[in-house]
């Protein structure tokens, strides 16, 4: 998976609409640094990626069954709506396909004092022939949006994301503490090491 663009609105300390064009602003830089004082929004960029892909963040997850852990709490104080959007691409049948995943949420009547409403999850695919975005799914119900996201993400889970792409504070050893099987599964999904496993198997067969 290759990330191309992050867009967000009213997440944590980042008020209003913000965007980071990873292609245009970073070019082919293999390594880059996100730098800023505490509270400037560095981790919020990672939150936006996790929200767009998984509907939760490493710091806030409904799985913890705590009121304060609701992912909707990333909405900036005093605002009535928020969204996180990620544009990414991945190889499918030899071609690179481009997708756009969005997590969006608002309070009742989009008022700052309204009750939080259920988030909407949207997944779009870019039609390379027309240059238009095709909506694959856009719904608040997991039974509709989850199968499409699972198919595109090819089994990548929020735990994989936490362990290999984002280690939140206090979880820096998460990837190292994972079992050998868990680490192998994560690395295989991220680096497509299945090709090398097949090469190894053929080499072993030829040697025997």
Residue locations for each model-derived region?
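Extreme N-terminal "head/tail" segments of very large remodeling/mechanoenzyme assemblies
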Residues: 1-153, 160-162
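Extended, Lys/Glu-rich alpha-helical coiled-coil stalks
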Residues: 33, 37, 130-135, 140-146, ...
